[in-house]
């Protein structure tokens, strides 16, 4: 992987060279997340709030047989135009590069790319986790493996409500991933505040969390550090309403023979319907809140932490 060409935008390259805070972002949410033009509105809102914190945004994606870090307006247009870029997880990076396709990176791909490219901290709205039917399908997201094996700080709103959040928390513990709540003592469920899985470690102080994360990355652990941010009460969806929608949709999915990756879209459509599409608004708002929290943590990291990543590339 270290022989793969990496193309940095001038802004990201300058930030790397000078130890400025940088925040990695996935491109899949731009290409395959919200419908147009809400996807662009969300991207621009996130870009603005990251910059307002004095942090450089670094969108990750693949084009022209290169891993790209930092997007120009032309790149953003490429990632949102039809035909859509292919969705790239960590396992797909090499093939996407070899085939010369345009790739929109998921969380797992972005975490891998961030470590490779010297980007120390990455933010995403929702991670994958352990599925509720794990005993039958053995379905566990690659996101968990990537967090455990990459020296990258990850900031997220947890995992979606239809996953098995207590089991996801247990897997992260088994993998040795530190999980810390930023302003929350409960493992958040994306656009829901409650999950029933409580966190052993949490803090209100971004500097304290940044210090702990940097210490883990530099000296303690072989892998990453996960920081969880719960949605504010103003934007969060009702936990019971979403849980009922999830349970009904999973029963319907089983009776209709919906399996594997198709379950995610099936359940998300059910939640959209049950909430009168308020879930799409919540998706937008959660992403903005998470990148704001991530940017606060990024700017709390010392310049030496970012400069050291350049030396290790």
UniProtKB/Swiss-Prot annotation:
Keywords assigned by UniProt, alphabetized: Glycosidase, Hydrolase, Lyase, Manganese, Metal-binding, Plasmid
Record EC number: 4.2.1.70
Note describing how the cofactor binds: Binds 1 Mn(2+) ion per subunit.
Entry's Gene Ontology cellular component terms: cytoplasm
Pfam families in the record: Indigoidine_A
Binding-site residues for Mn(2+), renumbered to this chain: 139
Family under the similarity heading: Belongs to the pseudouridine-5'-phosphate glycosidase family.
Described purpose of this protein according to its UniProt entry: Catalyzes the reversible cleavage of pseudouridine 5'-phosphate (PsiMP) to ribose 5-phosphate and uracil. Functions biologically in the cleavage direction, as part of a pseudouridine degradation pathway.
Description of how the protein assembles with itself and partners: Homotrimer.
Descriptive protein name: Pseudouridine-5'-phosphate glycosidase
Organism the protein comes from: Corynebacterium aurimucosum (strain ATCC 700975 / DSM 44827 / CIP 107346 / CN-1)
Lineage: Bacteria, Bacillati, Actinomycetota, Actinomycetes, Mycobacteriales
């Amino acid at each position: 992987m270290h022989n793969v060409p990496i193309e940095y935008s001038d802004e990201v390259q300058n930030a790397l060279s000078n130890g400025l805070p940088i925040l990695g972002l996935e491109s899949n949410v731009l290409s395959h997340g919200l419908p147009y033009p809400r996807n662009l509105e969300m991207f621009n809102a996130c870009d603005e709030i990251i910059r307002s914190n004095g942090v450089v945004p670094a969108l990750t994606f693949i084009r022209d047989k290169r891993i790209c870090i930092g997007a120009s307006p032309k790149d953003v247009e490429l990632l949102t135009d039809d035909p859509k870029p292919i969705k790239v997880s960590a396992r797909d990076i090499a093939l996407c590069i070899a085939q010369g396709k345009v790739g929109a990176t998921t969380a797992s791909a972005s975490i891998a790319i961030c470590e490779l490219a010297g980007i120390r901290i990455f933010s995403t709205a929702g991670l994958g986790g352990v599925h509720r039917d794990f005993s039958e399908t053995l379905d566990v997201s690659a996101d968990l493996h990537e967090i455990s094996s990459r020296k990258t700080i990850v900031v997220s709103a947890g995992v979606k409500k239809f996953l098995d959040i207590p089991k996801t928390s247990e897997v992260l513990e088994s993998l040795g991933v530190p999980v810390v709540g930023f302003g929350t003592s409960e493992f958040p469920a994306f656009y829901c505040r409650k999950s029933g899985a409580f966190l052993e470690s949490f803090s209100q102080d971004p500097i304290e969390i940044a210090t702990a994360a940097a210490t883990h990355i530099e000296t303690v652990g072989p892998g990453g550090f996960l920081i969880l941010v719960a949605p504010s009460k103003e934007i969060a969806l009702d936990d019971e309403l979403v849980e009922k929608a999830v349970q009904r949709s999973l029963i319907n999915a089983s009776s209709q023979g919906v399996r594997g990756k198709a379950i995610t879209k099936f359940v998300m459509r059910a939640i959209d319907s049950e909430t009168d599409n308020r879930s799409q608004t919540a998706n937008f708002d959660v992403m903005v809140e998470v990148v704001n929290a991530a940017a606060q943590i990024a700017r709390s990291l010392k310049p030496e932490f970012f400069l050291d990543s350049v030396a290790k590339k």
